[in-house]
């Protein structure tokens, strides 16, 4: 048995757009403005970030149609450089990237949902954490029930967040037509000339563009992936780039620099200045955006763990699917459990600082693998074949992106590297070591879990999808 191909072109576009447009564009686009120090330069950096992300997404489109396995960078690194480096990538995602990002998104959703009830103070800690936990559990149930349920939820919430941003953009255009153009006069005045500051501004923009690889996590479930994967990317990336630039133009038309930099939620401040009695809709839009982003993150992460288990890098139980619903329920439940554990960490937002280096390192390594496979397997069928200029330029830029956190946030970056390297002994003891030499209690425990899962929950192991 295998996962069913149920993700259409429209679903693919919704997954990419829904994951890329999270809370960032509503809450904290000021990161780019802080380091660029001018409206004009900040818009240029948003455009550069969009172009860079388009190049990366196109490279992933070639990889996804050449290596038709789910798992995104994990699958591509495994194919190019072998199991050890792929496991370290998987271990980093399991231990820090996926559960941390999902916990943060869920908490942000909960805070914006209950904020109207506590207009003059922070929402209670326990209330926001319980709502966040309920959100994660509900989305896990939806995606466990049917793949179509998860994609329909994604479609609805993607439409909602795009509609909210269109409202902001139209409001900004109206203000510009009314003569609110003072912030765009001499818009490059005061621009930062510090290479380090410009680098950090670009890094902030690229953080908001992250998520363009979402569809590559579910390649095996896409209908006609040779067509729909690259087409979904080609449609999604310009949409997000244009929306981001126009949304920032709208913010700049209404708010001066001091107001933007002082705001904890720029979209909410914008709504307070322009939407009057309807300003309450924007916090709700932020919550909906977080909900949709969390859903796409859960879909992607569960497939990553599913593929990792199928490759023998995680327990076999996680590679099972329901015999009737064709959903990777054990992987979804495992992902849910990890996210719930991280909800108990009081300063979970601090954990985000640990994985910027690892994220870009493994993305760059995936695309370096694209170049390597061109040399190693030149005759391999490639439904989409880009000029080598694209992956080479992207890899050179990733060297810069990996160097930035080492320079600007050395301690947190070193902690992130240590977290990744903690997977080395796990790999050699649990995977590289022959099964006969592993502790018998571990082998028996994993076998018992697999049998229990099969016999009591109607799950079966899946076959490897080897179609290239």
Swiss-Prot record:
Q: What is this protein called?
A: Y+L amino acid transporter 2
Any transmembrane segments, and where? Answer: 7-27, 41-61, 77-97, 130-150, 162-182, 198-218, 229-249, 274-294, 326-346, 348-368, 386-406, 414-434
This chain's function reads: Heterodimer with SLC3A2, that functions as an antiporter which operates as an efflux route by exporting cationic amino acids such as L-arginine from inside the cells in exchange with neutral amino acids like L-leucine, L-glutamine and isoleucine, plus sodium ions and may participate in nitric oxide synthesis. Also exchanges L-arginine with L-lysine in a sodium-independent manner. The transport mechanism is electroneutral and operates with a stoichiometry of 1:1.
Recorded catalytic activity of this chain's protein: L-lysine(out) + L-arginine(in) = L-lysine(in) + L-arginine(out); L-leucine(out) + L-arginine(in) + Na(+)(out) = L-leucine(in) + L-arginine(out) + Na(+)(in); L-glutamine(out) + L-arginine(in) + Na(+)(out) = L-glutamine(in) + L-arginine(out) + Na(+)(in); L-histidine(out) + L-arginine(in) + Na(+)(out) = L-histidine(in) + L-arginine(out) + Na(+)(in)
Extracellular side residue ranges read 28-40, 98-129, 183-197, 250-273, 347, 407-413
Query: From the record, what ranges are coiled-coil?
Result: none
The way it spans or sits in the membrane comes to:
Multi-pass membrane protein
Which residues are exposed on the Cytoplasmic face of the membrane? 1-6, 62-76, 151-161, 219-228, 295-325, 369-385, 435-468
Relate the assembly described in the record. Answer: Disulfide-linked heterodimer with the amino acid transport protein SLC3A2/4F2hc.
Kindly list the biological process annotations in GO that this record carries. amino acid transmembrane transport; glycine betaine transport; L-arginine transmembrane transport; neutral amino acid transport; nitric oxide biosynthetic process
Task: Supply the InterPro entries for this chain.
Answer: AA/rel_permease1, AminoAcid_Transporter
Record's subcellular location: Cell membrane
Pfam families assigned to the protein according to its UniProt record, in alphabetical order = AA_permease_2
Can you tell me which family this protein belongs to? Belongs to the amino acid-polyamine-organocation (APC) superfamily. L-type amino acid transporter (LAT) (TC 2.A.3.8) family.
Query: Which terms in the GO cellular component ontology are assigned?
Result: plasma membrane
List GO molecular-function terms, semicolon-separated: arginine binding; L-amino acid transmembrane transporter activity; L-arginine transmembrane transporter activity; L-lysine:L-arginine antiporter activity
**Which PANTHER family does the UniProt entry name for this protein?**
AMINO ACID TRANSPORTER, Y+L AMINO ACID TRANSPORTER 2
